[in-house]
Amino acid sequence: MTFEQLIPLIIMAFALGMDAFSVSLGMGMMALKIRQILYIGVTIGIFHIIMPFIGMVLGRFLSEQYGDIAHFAGAILLIGLGFYIVYSSILENEETRTAPIGISLFVFAFGVSIDSFSVGLSLGIYGAQTVITILLFGFISMLLAWTGLFIGRHAKGMLGTYGEIVGGIILVGFGLYLLFPI
């Protein structure tokens, strides 16, 4: 693979990773420990490897009609997660709130990586080099998720008790933006 072929993939990886960054800003406003932040970033990175890989494999066999469905599902997942965070911030006390672990972490990672599935479909149709592509997507998304989580964690300290509500609203807003781009 030449440098000229690598540049578009890096740009595409940053574009896909910006979803993870933006959403991680909101998620970072939860009371997360450093270890949880690292685990969340790695999980997002892994999903940004798995989803485009599946998309690339299926892209060799399927048409691009599933791109809109993946985009819609990702937006709905983000909106639902955002509403859940706002709900839990308002109705539950600090001690009962939990960080995204288990199923909720997988839903979160799936939601921010589902766009990479549709990109993988397209790249699979065009025969992109699978290993380099998915490793770039995963690594850059992981770094951007960590950046968003750390910035969100710092912003929570400045926003006080309203930090999680703001984070949930960011998730809802980002999901709505995916549904209705400006």
From Swiss-Prot:
Record GO cellular component, one term: plasma membrane
Keyword Transmembrane part of the UniProt annotation: yes
Record's keyword terms, sorted: Cell membrane, Ion transport, Manganese, Membrane, Transmembrane, Transmembrane helix, Transport
Annotated transmembrane regions: 6-26, 37-57, 71-91, 101-121, 131-151, 162-182
Top-level division of the source organism's lineage: Bacteria
Regions annotated as coiled coil: none
Cell compartments where the protein resides: Cell membrane
Major localization listed first in the record, in broad terms: membrane
Keyword ATP-binding on entry: no
Bilayer topology term: Multi-pass membrane protein
GO molecular function: manganese ion transmembrane transporter activity
Pfam families: Mntp
Role noted for this protein: Probably functions as a manganese efflux pump.
Protein family (similarity comment): Belongs to the MntP (TC 9.B.29) family.
Name of the protein described by the UniProt record: Putative manganese efflux pump MntP
Species of the source: Bacillus cereus (strain Q1)
